[in-house]
C-alpha cells in the first residue's frame, strides 16, 4: 500500500507492496520529520518540547518469522534540551508512553495507567496481541499464548525447572 512518490523520494524501484516502495516511504518520512523539526526549532517553545515518534504496528510482511523482529516498532523521543541522545534495546509497549511523558514533563499528582516509564532502569516487558494470540516479550524470553495453552516460546536461558516459562505465562495471562 505504498503510493509512488516523486523525485527525490523515489530512490528505489517502486512497487505498491514491495520493499522498494517501503524504502521510498521511509526516505520521504525521514525528510518530512526533519522538515517539521527544523521549522519547529524557530518557535519559542522548542526548548521545552518533547517529540515522540513511533508506529502503531510493524510491517510484518517484510519481517522474518522471528517474533522479536515481527513486533518491533521504533520509538524516537527527541527533546535536545531535556534528554541526552542514546539508544536502548529496552522492551516497551504503547501503554508505556503516557507514564513516560508524565515523568519527562515532571508532572505531579496521581494517575492510573498499566504502563511504566521507559526511562526507568527496569528492563521492562511488552505484551502484544496478534489476533486471538497474546505475546509477551521480556529479557527472559518470548512466549505466545492462546489463553488456553502456550503456542510458541523462545527463552533466553535454559529453564530446567520451568520457572521462567511459568513466570512469563503468569504475567502474560494476568496482563490480558
Regions found by a protein language model. Name each.
Residues 1-176:
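Solvent-exposed soluble domains appended to multi-pass membrane proteins
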